[in-house]
C-alpha cells in the first residue's frame, strides 16, 4: 500500500501538479500559435484554471513540510479544479448547442481593470475563437471533454491525497 501512496508525498506531488499544469499550458499554446487553433472565452477561463493548478503546485513545492503552505496549495488546487470543472462543463454544453445550430459565446473576457490579462498578454489570454467550434479531438473527444476529465481527475487525486496522504512525507 505504501508504494501506491508514494506519489502523494508532498515532495513529489506538488512539483508534479505544477509541472503537469505547465505542460498542459505549453500544449494549448502550441495548438494556438503553431497549429492555428483560436481559443474561445471559455478556453481562456480553462487556461486560468490550469494556471491555478500551476500556482497551487508552486506554493506546495516551496514548503513541502509546511501545513500552512500545504493547506493553501490544497485550497488552490480545489478552487482551480472546481472552476475547471465548471468551465469545461460549460464548454461541453456550448459544443452540444453549436452542433444543434445554437449557442452563444462572448468574445471579450471582462478582466478587472487592475489585472487586464487580455491586454497585458493578448497572445495567451485574448479569445479569438467561437466556444462551440470543435477544432481538435483525441480518441473522438473534444478538448473540452478532455479538460473536464483532467479537472475531475485532479479533484479525485486531491481527495486521495487529503484522505490517504497525510503522513507520506
UniProtKB/Swiss-Prot annotation:
Q: Which residues lie on this side of the membrane: Periplasmic?
A: 31-48, 90-145
Q: Does the keyword Transmembrane apply?
A: yes
Source organism, top-level taxon: Bacteria
Query: Residue ranges, Cytoplasmic compartment?
Result: 1-13, 65-71, 165-169
Membrane topology classification: Multi-pass membrane protein
A GO cellular component term found in this entry reads:
plasma membrane
Cite a single Pfam family from the UniProt record. Answer: DsbB
The GO molecular function terms of this record are: electron transfer activity; protein-disulfide reductase activity
Task: Provide the disulphide bond pattern.
Answer: 40-43, 105-131
The UniProt keywords, alphabetically, are: Cell inner membrane, Cell membrane, Chaperone, Disulfide bond, Electron transport, Membrane, Oxidoreductase, Redox-active center, Transmembrane, Transmembrane helix, Transport
The cellular location(s) given in this protein's UniProt record come to: Cell inner membrane
Q: SUPFAM superfamilies given for it?
A: DsbB-like
Main localization category: membrane
Q: Briefly, what is this protein's role?
A: Required for disulfide bond formation in some periplasmic proteins. Acts by oxidizing the DsbA protein.
Q: What is this protein called?
A: Disulfide bond formation protein B 2
Q: Which source organism does the UniProt entry give?
A: Pseudomonas aeruginosa (strain ATCC 15692 / DSM 22644 / CIP 104116 / JCM 14847 / LMG 12228 / 1C / PRS 101 / PAO1)
Amino acid at each position: 500500500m505504501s508504494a501506491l501512496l508514494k506519489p502523494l508525498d508532498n515532495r513529489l506531488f506538488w512539483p508534479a501538479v505544477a509541472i503537469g499544469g505547465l505542460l498542459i499550458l505549453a500544449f494549448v499554446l502550441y495548438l494556438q500559435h503553431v497549429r492555428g487553433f483560436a481559443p474561445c472565452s471559455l478556453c481562456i477561463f480553462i487556461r486560468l484554471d490550469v494556471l491555478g493548478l500551476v500556482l497551487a503546485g508552486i506554493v506546495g513545492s516551496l514548503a513541502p513540510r509546511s501545513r500552512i503552505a500545504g493547506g493553501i496549495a490544497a485550497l488552490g488546487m480545489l478552487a482551480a479544479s472546481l472552476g475547471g470543472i465548471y468551465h469545461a462543463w460549460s464548454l461541453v454544453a456550448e459544443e452540444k448547442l453549436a452542433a444543434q445550430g445554437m449557442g452563444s459565446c462572448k468574445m471579450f473576457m471582462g478582466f478587472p481593470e487592475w489585472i487586464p490579462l487580455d491586454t497585458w498578454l493578448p497572445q495567451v489570454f485574448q479569445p479569438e475563437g467561437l466556444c462551440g467550434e470543435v477544432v481538435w479531438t483525441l480518441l473522438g473527444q473534444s478538448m473540452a471533454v478532455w479538460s473536464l476529465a483532467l479537472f475531475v481527475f485532479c479533484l479525485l487525486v486531491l481527495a486521495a491525497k487529503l484522505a490517504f496522504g497525510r503522513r507520506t512525507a
